[in-house]
Amino acid sequence: MAEGGAADLDIQRSDIATLLKTSLRKGDTWYLVDSRWFKQWKKYVGFDSWDKYQMGDQNVYPGPIDNSGLLRDGDAQSLKEHLIDELDYILLPTEGWNKLVSWYTLMEGQEPIARKVVEQGMFVKHCKVEVYLTELKLCENGNMNNVVTRRFSKADTIDTIEKEIRKIFNIPDEKETRLWNKYMSNTFEPLNKPDSTIQDAGLYQGQVLVIEQKNEDGTWPRGPSTPNVKNSNYCLPSYTAYKNYDYSEPGRNNEQPGLCGLSNLGNTCFMNSAFQCLSNTPPLTEYFLNDKYQEELNFDNPLGMRGEIAKSYAELIKQMWSGKYSYVTPRAFKTQVGRFAPQFSGYQQQDCQELLAFLLDGLHEDLNRIRKKPYIQLKDADGRPDKVVAEEAWENHLKRNDSIIVDIFHGLFKSTLVCPECAKISVTFDPFCYLTLPLPMKKERTLEVYLVRMDPLTKPMQYKVVVPKIGNILDLCTALSLLSGVPADKMIVTDIYNHRFHRIFAMDENLSSIMERDDIYVFEININRTEDTEHVIIPVCLREKFRHSSYTHHTGSSLFGQPFLMAVPRNNTEDKLYNLLLVRMCRYVKISTDTEDTEGSLHCCKDQNINGNGPNGIHEEGSPSEMETDEPDDESSQDQELPSENENSQSEDSVGGDNDSENGLCTEETCRGQLTGHKKRLFTFQFNNLGNTDINYIKDDTRHIRFDDRQLRLDERSFLALDWDPDLKKRYFDENAAEDFEKHESVEYKPPKKPFVKLKDCIELFTTKEKLGAEDPWYCPNCKEHQQATKKLDLWSLPPVLVVHLKRFSYSRYMRDKLDTLVDFPINDLDMSEFLINPNAGPCRYNLIAVSNHYGGMGGGHYTAFAKNKDDGKWYYFDDSSVSTASEDQIVSKAAYVLFYQRQDTFSGTGFFPLDRETKGASAATGIPLESDEDSNDNDNDIENENCMHTN
């Protein structure tokens, strides 16, 4: 436990602040600390200059480091999925962790969460703490049913793994062994490079490793291996073909080309889904299958990947479209992606659309036909016609970017910004590779809260309330009032963490500050907080006192139980305040049944009416005129204790009585009764308000108390602590009863199915004028200042393949959420003409060819894909290694995340769009389609082109 004065806390604050700035170095060890514990520590040491009110205050002492909030239940080392740095945890270097542990210790039963710093990136190296380890399954060759799971860092070597396996299975040091990587049911790959790391070897989450012991006669149970397999860092037995991908049922030749699944390497369904959508984009796949990419590989582009991504992509596409395999394992492709985009190098679930964006950009730069990009000065429209500015913007784009990706996926939109001060209009035309469409925001969210009633005998009740997504605390209280009948203005909303009030909310605070994992308690207080001048509301916490040693008078304390809010008379006596507190806790404070307790039962106040008219449901005795006040004691300490009652004295409100409680807990009758006083009170008081003592009383027999409104604040940093002696706590405090609660029927509430929105609604929302946020202003060249301008996006020209990203995921400082709105999108004949402002836009009808689906929420989920095979024209469902037929009525669902549309005029011929590359630039910029002899006589196309004309 940390002790000492402010100087010691200054050292703590300074040391940790310095160590938090430590640079990451490959191989170093860092430690995770739960952010909620760390925030409490920051309060205690006055870490932030604006929050030093409680510095050194034992009432906010953080206690032992508690990382339980980061861990899965029942697992001392397995982290919850999708934890976010700084939001959920803080990273500390070894020295910083050791200091914190020496000052505060670690919660009993917990282990340090240590993680290595690994190096990532192919050309630009950078270090990163590997928060999530790779879980491997280990077994012996002779007994593969006995599987042991262990977690390793990507920086760990094969030798490290083998030593761990030998240790697990008690293999003697003199016994010769070798290690195998087991795929599927009967495919094995020897891991014979002991210095290679897990990352180098391409081992993935859930991979099975088999250790094999040499026979006594010098032979190996699995036979000899052949270390000469081409294109592999590791070798396979000679009977197994291996070229970067592992196949199911080698030699099978009756598969429909393209109907090839992708094995899940461990949370890689996002990659599989994205790849299946691209694989079933006919123009792109034909380009790679016909080897056109080889003549356009750009090895010198500083923005590219030296052609590695394009070559790896091509190899995988060829395997999937060979018709030989029902599925392949894209291990080499995953490794290449991780080398150039370290964010995808691990085995955490990632965003499919983010990977698509990387792949499209990476393929573009690897295949960019421009070998030397010229510098181009961007120009504003300055009143010029849109057609002129659009053509100029597209030509400039092609001078630096010209690839198959541009040919297929790039379009042009118009951006208009208007300054609110000087009315300056800025018009630019910018290329896009995909459209990210906003969804109508979910207007509501559900929160689980606990309502604590005034009646002390009533258990807290858990409710599920529906509140506005963009609302405030008053909205929560209003919703809870409808369910409970408690007026909203009689509620106070709090966040309880680690036996203390983490936050006490004001009614106008935003609900976005409440996170999903917060424990929200709402207290009923029967006073008008703005008009009642006779009462004050105080937060009350429970503490267990203890001595540091038998020969010292220095004491410490630790919090326990649930804190509560309580309204008490502003002028009071110590006796009456004690009685009010005791009655407030009577549901879980035991009545003495010991025969040795000759003085009787607990000390409760006389004639206290549980259902009375007091602010806590308790009738209050005494006139304010009886309660005198006095100036504060100059000798009072910062955290002043109200002394225990003299053993020979008795409260003026206490008279003798009997206790007939059968279950050992206070009942309504016993609380109402006239109970005798204890020889010794169960607890004493300590009040703290922003580090100052705010209870003033006279040290005489009456012990009058006055709460000063100039000093008292309803704040999580101001509270009354009830200090319990350990023996009395153990004897009289029922912790199980204190934690008990009931569930309201609303907890079982399931939100009704939401009405669907049309894809066109999302496009309209995309093109709606909006005001820029204060955090994202526009620099006005006229005003020479950043302004919150209005911005409007319009579509000018569309590409042959239109990728539509439905923005389902939203992120904020306090919350992560997924919109599960059903978007109704057409499978055939998506007509985009009404959204194109270019009067010569050309063909603009699309058919759906692929969909990436995401099932689940922010905390996890699974990606799959629907795609239309370019050869047989049928729909299929791709779920990792599984491929099955699908019907069109399955495709539109609330799981749809990324849509791939192909323009109808590009389906003719070989499947590659009938646009000549040399003239593609002018066509895309102007929107005028190139006509073939066939098209020029096609009345349907004439009608379609006419329909695409902009009309006003």
Curated annotation (Swiss-Prot):
GO cellular component, one term: cytoplasm
Cellular location(s): Cytoplasm; Nucleus; Mitochondrion
Active site (record annotation): 269 (nucleophile), 862 (proton acceptor)
TM helices/strands, residue ranges: none
Residue span of region Mediates interaction with SART3: 2-223
Keyword Membrane among UniProt keywords: no
Stretches assigned to the DUSP domain: 7-118
The record's account of how the chain is modified after translation: Phosphorylated. Phosphorylation protects against ubiquitination and subsequent degradation by the proteasome.
A Pfam family annotated for this UniProt entry: USP7_C2
Compositional bias annotation for Acidic residues: 627-644, 931-945
USP domain residues: 260-904
Modification type Phosphoserine: residues: 932, 936
Main location: cytoplasm
GO-annotated biological processes: BMP signaling pathway; monoubiquitinated protein deubiquitination; negative regulation of antifungal innate immune response; negative regulation of transforming growth factor beta receptor signaling pathway; protein K27-linked deubiquitination; proteolysis; transcription elongation-coupled chromatin remodeling
Record's keyword terms, sorted: Acetylation, Cytoplasm, Hydrolase, Mitochondrion, Nucleus, Phosphoprotein, Protease, Thiol protease, Ubl conjugation, Ubl conjugation pathway
Superkingdom: Eukaryota
Annotated function: Hydrolase that removes conjugated ubiquitin from target proteins and regulates various pathways such as the TGF-beta receptor signaling, NF-kappa-B and RNF41/NRDP1-PRKN pathways. Acts as a key regulator of TGF-beta receptor signaling pathway, but the precise mechanism is still unclear: according to a report, acts by promoting deubiquitination of monoubiquitinated R-SMADs (SMAD1, SMAD2 and/or SMAD3), thereby alleviating inhibition of R-SMADs and promoting activation of TGF-beta target genes.
Subunit relationships: A homodimer structure has been reported; however it is unclear whether the protein form a homodimer in vivo. Identified in a complex with the COP9 signalosome complex (CSN). Interacts with SMAD1, SMAD2 and SMAD3; the interaction is direct. Forms a complex with SMURF2 and SMAD7. Interacts with TGFBR1. Interacts with SART3; the interaction is direct. May interact with RNF20 and RNF40. May interact with PRKN. Interacts with INCA1.
Family: Belongs to the peptidase C19 family.
Entry protein name: Ubiquitin carboxyl-terminal hydrolase 15
